């Protein structure tokens, strides 16, 4: 792969010295085991690979095949209108897109999917439907401020009422439109079967904020203004029912999809919260908000939840994200999520991938350099 070596050398001054010897991979025995017996993640993945996109390190022991793989750490990037050139994503494992702000499947996500086929990446969906539907009805994000004061009404004051009034006929409708739209789009590809194409759906970031427990907790906190849901939060058990209906809707059109349940690090009783969900429908746990800590065992410094604690509790791999903050504003490439020592520490905690939402054009090169230095994941049944 002469072209790859040329790129690596060209950016060597910025990123790493270009050498004929790659760093040796840490011994798999150094990684603590986390039991995944209830829902092992490995064999069902049908990885999209092509020799034209296979990246081989200078060590003959490491070969990278693009496409999400539970046996190694995965690197993803957010889909942006400023970066629709396939070369920007070449060599990455997945591309993510946020859905929810339209009633219909549109060209933006269709173009994302097309690029995933060109670079052999897995499509990832941030399904932010409830919040975006709420914005269409005048609700702000809970942490939105104007002139130093929290904006109301917001998702922490009226989100639960929105769900009660519109879940079946509007919120699930959007999920049907998106999933059916992807299915119809895939059918245009002669060599793709919508029944086997694997997506990863990150279902409803901040789902907890609409619940009874979330409302009670928020009302006692100044972080989001001390707001409570008008009319009360949705009963926690019903939040689990709504989650299952969303998953079933997605899989009715895209049955090979993998599902991630949201992690809200501020939840006071994580075990009680997740007990409301049918975890047999869940393949991953995922963060949202982009301000997660690569350098710490805590997901966020201000909260008690840890990467390993969530992975152990759910017995599921964890997907992290970085490079954006409140309101989805990009903050650029997060360097901490590119350092070998940080990544290996998080791999040992059960983290299986990171989405850089606002990377630069050298991101895929950095990923190609660090891959051979990373431990295998603790979730791989083939280790």
PLM regions and their residue ranges:
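C-terminal motif of bacterial Sec signal peptides marking the signal peptidase cleavage site
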Residues: 14-17
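Aromatic-lined carbohydrate-recognition surfaces of secreted/lumenal glycan-active proteins
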Residues: 202-204, 230-271, 287, 315-327
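Aromatic- and acid-rich polysaccharide-binding/catalytic face
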Residues: 97, 272-301, 357-359
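Substrate-binding cleft of extracellular glycoside hydrolase catalytic domains
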Residues: 111-245, 252-256
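Acidic/polar, low-complexity intrinsically disordered N-terminal segments immediately downstream
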Residues: 22-67
């Amino acid at each position: 792969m002469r072209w790859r070596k040329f790129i690596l050398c060209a950016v060597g001054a910025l990123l790493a010295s270009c050498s004929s010897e790659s760093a040796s991979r840490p011994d798999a025995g150094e990684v603590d085991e986390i039991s995944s017996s209830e829902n092992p993640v490995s064999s069902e993945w049908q990885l999209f690979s092509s020799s034209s996109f296979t990246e081989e390190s200078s060590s003959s022991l490491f070969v990278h095949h693009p496409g999400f793989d539970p046996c190694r750490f995965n690197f993803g990037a957010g889909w942006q209108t400023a970066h629709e050139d396939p070369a920007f994503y070449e060599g990455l494992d997945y591309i993510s897109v946020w859905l929810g702000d339209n009633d219909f499947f549109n060209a933006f996500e269709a173009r994302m999917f097309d690029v995933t086929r060109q670079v052999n990446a897995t499509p990832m969906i941030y399904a932010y439907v409830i919040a975006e539907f709420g914005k269409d009805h005048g609700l702000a994000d809970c942490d939105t401020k104007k002139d130093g004061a929290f904006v109301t009404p917001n998702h922490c004051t009226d989100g639960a009422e929105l769900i009660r009034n519109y879940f079946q006929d509007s919120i699930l409708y959007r999920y049907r439109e998106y999933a059916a739209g992807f299915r119809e789009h895939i059918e245009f590809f002669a060599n793709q079967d919508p029944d086997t194409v694997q997506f990863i759906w990150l279902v409803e970031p901040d789902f907890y904020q609409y619940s009874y427990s979330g409302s009670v907790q928020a009302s006692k906190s100044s972080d989001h203004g001390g707001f409570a849901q008008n009319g009360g939060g949705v009963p926690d058990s019903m939040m689990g029912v709504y989650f299952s209906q969303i998953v079933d809707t997605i899989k009715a059109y895209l049955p090979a999809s993998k599902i991630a349940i949201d992690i809200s690090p501020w939840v006071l009783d994580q075990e009680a919260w997740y007990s409301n969900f049918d975890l047999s429908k869940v393949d991953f746990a995922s963060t949202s908000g982009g301000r997660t800590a690569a350098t710490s065992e805590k997901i966020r410094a201000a909260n008690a939840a840890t990467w390993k604690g969530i992975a152990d509790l759910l017995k599921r791999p964890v997907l992290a994200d970085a490079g954006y903050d409140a309101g989805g504003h990009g903050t650029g490439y997060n360097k901490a999520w590119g350092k070998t020592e940080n990544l290996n520490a998080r791999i040992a905690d059960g983290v299986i991938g990171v989405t850089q939402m606002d990377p630069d054009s050298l991101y895929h090169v950095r990923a190609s350099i660090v891959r051979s230095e990373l431990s295998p994941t603790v979730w791989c049944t083939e280790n």
